């Protein structure tokens, strides 16, 4: 019978600067998921504010710094949704990408055209969607 040690594991992610210069607001109510996404973003060179578990915590972070992009969980604890925060970010010109554990929820019309990534999100997905948003340095 094979043991767990017999299975090949993927090598740990190496630090890179693929997203260097990109500031990201991360809103995720699961501490474990939030920390995992934050670590991956930082390994890719992004500067991360959060993870914020509530929209109030996210708004507090926005008072300190306007990000280049926001990664948001739509359904937060206690029935809280992030659509009000999404509207606020869009008014300020901040692109929004949703992270969802399920595509089984009805999508409000206010989210039309919004990129939705299913969790767990991969390094390749983050690079594909965040890379083009990286500030240009001349």
Residue ranges with predicted function:
Residues 1-23, 56, 115, 122-138:
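Non-catalytic signal-transmission and effector/linker regions of two-component phosphorelay proteins
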Residues 21, 66, 82, 90-96:
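His-Asp phosphorelay/catalytic-motif detector in bacterial-type signaling
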Residues 28:
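Conserved acidic carboxylate
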Residues 31-50:
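Two-component/phosphorelay signaling modules centered on CheY-like receiver
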Residues 51-69, 77:
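Acidic, metal-coordinating helix/loop segments flanking the phosphotransfer/catalytic sites
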Residues 72-90:
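Conserved phosphotransfer microenvironments
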Residues 99-100:
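Hydrophobic/aromatic residues positioned on beta-strands within the core alpha/beta folds
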Residues 110-117:
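As written
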């Amino acid at each position: 019978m094979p043991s767990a040690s017999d299975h090949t594991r993927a090598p740990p992610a190496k630090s890179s600067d693929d997203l260097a210069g990109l500031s990201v607001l991360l809103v995720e109510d699961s501490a474990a998921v939030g920390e995992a996404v934050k670590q991956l973003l930082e390994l890719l060179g992004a500067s991360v504010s959060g993870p914020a578990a509530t929209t109030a915590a996210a708004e507090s972070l926005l008072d300190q710094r306007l990000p280049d992009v926001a990664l948001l969980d739509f359904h937060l604890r206690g029935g809280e949704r992030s659509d009000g925060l999404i509207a606020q970010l869009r008014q300020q010109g901040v692109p929004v990408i949703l992270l969802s554990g399920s595509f089984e929820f009805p999508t409000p019309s206010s989210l039309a055209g919004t990129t939705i990534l299913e969790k767990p999100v991969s390094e390749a997905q983050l690079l594909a969607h965040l890379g083009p948003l990286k500030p240009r340095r001349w």
